[in-house]
UniProtKB/Swiss-Prot annotation:
This is 4-hydroxythreonine-4-phosphate dehydrogenase. A divalent metal cation binds at residues 176, 221, 276. Catalyzes the NAD(P)-dependent oxidation of 4-(phosphooxy)-L-threonine (HTP) into 2-amino-3-oxo-4-(phosphooxy)butyric acid which spontaneously decarboxylates to form 3-amino-2-oxopropyl phosphate (AHAP). Pfam families: PdxA. Keywords: Cobalt, Cytoplasm, Magnesium, Metal-binding, NAD, NADP, Oxidoreductase, Pyridoxine biosynthesis, Zinc. GO terms for molecular function: 4-hydroxythreonine-4-phosphate dehydrogenase activity; cobalt ion binding; magnesium ion binding; NAD binding; zinc ion binding. The gene is pdxA. Homodimer. Pathway: Cofactor biosynthesis; pyridoxine 5'-phosphate biosynthesis; pyridoxine 5'-phosphate from D-erythrose 4-phosphate: step 4/5. GO terms for cellular component: cytoplasm. It is an enzyme of class 1 (oxidoreductase). It is found in: Cytoplasm. It comes from Methylorubrum populi (strain ATCC BAA-705 / NCIMB 13946 / BJ001) (Methylobacterium populi). GO terms for biological process: pyridoxal phosphate biosynthetic process; pyridoxine biosynthetic process. The active site is located at the dimer interface.
Length: 349
């Protein structure tokens, strides 16, 4: 299959969360919202039951990978889990009995992309505690995908999480760690490696010839010359200097409290921030329903909706599919970009 003809591989996510219902909703809106063809990897009977319970007139078809695009016009294509495992879940009641199916769906999606049967991976939300209860060894989705991407006997690539929207794109340098651990983890090497990956993928995947990056400070006022913490002066500033010496357009460290207003956003393409919440709070404020999680540094395209499992509203029929639809559309654009040479990035000011 040509790249433009291949479907996206959508994972099951946690079946007790909103993933299954937003997948059904995305399929229903395929014409109205320009949703590209995708196949969901899971249990067809479970998806049928979910549609029935929610009162959604969504036909579900069990498919082989080669059939997904043709079927997508008339039914939601569901590729059974390779093991044939069945899924049973109660909305809002996460169950570690489904951990195996959740992990198998992710692994199968990566296998489809690596074999050429799918163009990109789009992941539905998972709950880490459901998986860690049964011995899952990875901090989250992103790190597990990096492990799957590693070639036999080689170190996994450094995965970089970018949250993308039409208004703002951000990268947290440290991800799912306690805030008190950040100063020890925030090394000059980590900042430089992260920025290099962002720069390289913005050029290769997003089509930006000269990406403009900024780096937020860690401390108030970016440390104010060391009077409010030394990390900005001793770690972040040397990293920026080293990156600029390599020809990467990056500024910082800059005070975080003035980095995300409209005029500031017009001066850069991506903002890197030392901590998870420094990066995610502004994008979720600006684009809560439209943000997309994009993993950079992998040998394949992976996107995800920028929200969690939402167990509190699962099964109530109120979950919005907007972020999933944005993730599906961006994944297709990134997978096709080398062929159509159209950048998925917002028009720069």
């Amino acid at each position: 299959m040509a790249s433009d003809d291949r479907p996206l591989a959508l994972t099951l996510g946690d079946p007790s969360g909103i993933g299954p219902e937003i997948a059904l909703a995305a399929w229903r809106l395929r014409g109205e919202r320009g949703v590209p063809p995708f196949q969901l990897i899971g249990d067809p009977e479970f998806l049928e039951a979910t549609a029935y319970r929610l009162g959604l007139s969504v036909p579900v078809a069990e498919v082989e990978p080669d059939d997904a695009v043709e079927v997508f016009a008339r039914a939601l294509p569901v590729l059974p889990l390779p093991s044939g495992a069945k899924v049973s879940a109660t909305p809002g009641a996460p169950d570690s009995a489904n951990a195996g199916a959740i992990v198998e769906s992710i692994t199968a999606a990566v296998d489809l992309v690596r074999s050429g049967a799918a163009s990109a991976v789009v992941t539905n939300p998972i709950a880490k505690f459901v998986l860690t209860r049964v011995g899952f060894a990875h901090p989250g989705h992103t790190e597990f995908l990096a492990a799957l991407a590693a070639r036999e006997g080689r170190e996994p690539p450094l995965p970089v999480m970018m949250l993308w929207s039409e208004l703002l794109a951000v990268v947290p340098v440290t991800i799912h760690v306690a805030l008190r651990r950040v100063p020890d983890l925030l090394t000059q090497e980590l900042v430089e490696r992260t920025a290099r990956i962002v720069h390289a993928d913005l050029r290769a995947r997003f089509g930006l010839e000269a990406p403009r990056l900024v780096l937020s400070g860690l401390n108030p006022h970016a440390g104010e010359s060391g009077t409010m913490g030394t990390e900005d002066r001793d770690v972040l500033a040397p990293a920026v200097a080293a990156l600029r010496a390599e020809g990467i357009d990056i500024r910082g460290p800059l005070p975080a409290d003035t980095l995300f207003h409209e005029r500031a956003r017009a001066t850069y393409d991506v903002a890197l921030a030392p901590t998870h919440d420094q990066a995610l709070i502004p994008i979720k404020t600006l684009a809560f329903d439209e943000g997309v999680n994009v993993t950079l540094g992998l040998p394949f395209v992976r996107t995800s909706p920028d929200h969690g499992t939402a167990f509190d509203i699962a099964g109530k029929g109120v979950a919005k599919p907007d972020s999933l639809i944005a993730a599906l559309r961006l994944a297709q654009r990134l997978a096709q970009r080398p062929a159509n040479n159209v950048t998925p990035f917002p028009v720069r000011a």
